[in-house]
Structures are given as C-alpha cells and as structure tokens.
Curated annotation (Swiss-Prot):
Taxonomy, superkingdom: Eukaryota
Organism: Homo sapiens
Domain MIF4G: 3-205
MF (Gene Ontology): identical protein binding; RNA binding; translation activator activity
Cellular component GO terms held in the UniProt record: cytoplasm; cytosol; Golgi apparatus; histone mRNA stem-loop binding complex; nucleolus
UniProt xrefs under SUPFAM superfamilies: ARM repeat
Subunit structure: Interacts with EIF4G1, EIF4G2 and SLBP; probably tethered by SLBP to the 3'-end of mRNAs ending with the histone stem-loop, it also interacts with EIF4G1 which is bound to their 5'-end.
Taxonomy of the source species: Eukaryota, Metazoa, Chordata, Craniata, Vertebrata
Name under which the protein is recorded: MIF4G domain-containing protein
Function: Functions in replication-dependent translation of histone mRNAs which differ from other eukaryotic mRNAs in that they do not end with a poly-A tail but a stem-loop. May participate in circularizing those mRNAs specifically enhancing their translation.
Gene: MIF4GD
Keyword ATP-binding: no
Similarity remark: Belongs to the MIF4GD family.
TM regions (residue ranges): none
Length: 222
C-alpha cells in the first residue's frame, strides 16, 4: 500500500471533521481514538454502498499504519467487534433496510478480501461471510434484484478465496443457487442471467471465458 494512495480514498461524503479524523488515522493512528474510527467507517459503510466497496482498502491501510507505529491492533479489534455485532443482528438489519443489508454484505466481503494474517484470509471471517451469502441465496432474497446483484458481485470478488478456505460450504451454496435458478416464479430475467453467469463462472475455475463475457455483458448492457 504505497503512500500516494492515501489521497485516493473516497471520503468526500464525510463531514469535514470526520474527513480529518480519517486522514489522521491513516497518517498518525496513535493520535486518534481508533475504536471511534472503526465505528465511523462501519456506520458510513452501512449507508453508502459506494464507500463500502472500498472501505476494506482504507481499513487495511489503518491497520498497517497502527501496527507499524505501535505494534498494536486496537483498530482491527474494534472493526471486527463491530462487524460481529452487525452480523448477529443481520436479519433485523435486512428487515429494516435492504440497502443497509446489501451494503453490510459488500463491506464484510471487502474486509475479507483485504485483511490478511500471514498472507492468508482471516479464518474468523470465513463463516460469517458464507452465512451472509447463504442468506442472499434464499428464495425470498433471489426475488430481489439488488440482493442477487450483491450475491453475484461478491462471489466474483471473493468466491475463489472462500472456496479455498472451505470448499464444502461453497458446494452447498451453489446447490442453493442452482435450486434458486430453477425457481418456477419470482425470478426476474436479469436475476436468472446473473445466476447462470456465476454458475458458469465457478464451473470455469472462477474465470469468465471470452465467449461468456461477450454473451452476458452484451445482454446486461442491452
């Protein structure tokens, strides 16, 4: 994570005081309350799906900066605690705000993608991430395009890593996805297309073949 990337974080949607807090956390983590920083990032991620897509990169940079400066992991601990709280209340979150739920799944997958221990994804996040994806593959979620879209995007992003960590759960997830694809009603044509694409993407070793890319992406753009 090079220094210039610090200015690339999309933090313009925060108020000036919070922007300053985040900038300080990236440069001088010991000077701020890192638990507060973790809460600010999670709160904003649940409201802003654009930010939740790249919050993992910022969290990774703060964790690196804190470790380098003080050899501590206050921020990481605060972040994981808050992720766990939201995870435990995920059904309530989904019932309250579908957008908040989709943002949460995007965020936890983003964190899983970026956070590493000895260059391996964090084991503590594997089952929570799987549980979120399993929820997205339930029939009532598959009838909502934003949830199907989230499921497919996250599998594109972290599916291969997740399968390496627990292949059996990925097999079970794809049984649900295939069953969902065959649902007699309730699935839009776009949702069917997205599910078929992710089934073929995994079957091809988590790669899109040129022919599939041309077919699916011309269909989606139409």
């Amino acid at each position: 994570m090079g220094e210039p990337s610090r200015e690339e974080y999309k933090i313009q949607s925060f108020d000036a005081e919070t922007q300053q807090l985040l900038k300080t956390a990236l440069k001088d983590p010991g000077a701020v309350d890192l638990e507060k920083v973790a809460n600010v990032i999670v709160d904003h991620s649940l409201q802003d799906c654009v930010f939740s897509k790249e919050a993992g990169r910022m969290c990774y940079a703060i964790i690196q900066a804190e470790s380098k400066q003080a050899g501590q992991s206050v921020f990481r601990r605060g972040l994981l605690n808050r992720l766990q709280q939201e995870y435990q209340a995920r059904e309530q979150l989904r019932a309250r705000s579908l957008q908040g739920w989709v943002c949460y799944v995007t965020f936890i997958c983003n964190i899983f993608d970026y956070l590493r221990v000895n260059n391996m994804p964090m084991m503590a996040l594997v089952n929570p991430v799987y549980d979120c994806l399993f929820r997205l593959a339930q029939p009532d979620s598959l009838s909502k395009e934003e949830e199907v879209d989230c499921l497919v995007l996250q599998l594109h992003r972290v599916g291969e890593q997740l399968e390496k960590m627990n292949g059996q759960r990925m097999d079970e997830l794809f049984v649900l996805i295939r069953d969902g694809f065959l649902l007699p009603t309730g699935l839009s044509s776009l949702a069917q297309l997205l599910l078929l694409e992710i089934i073929e993407f995994r079957a091809a070793g988590w790669k899109t073949t040129p022919a599939a890319h041309k077919y699916y992406y011309s269909e989606v753009s139409d």
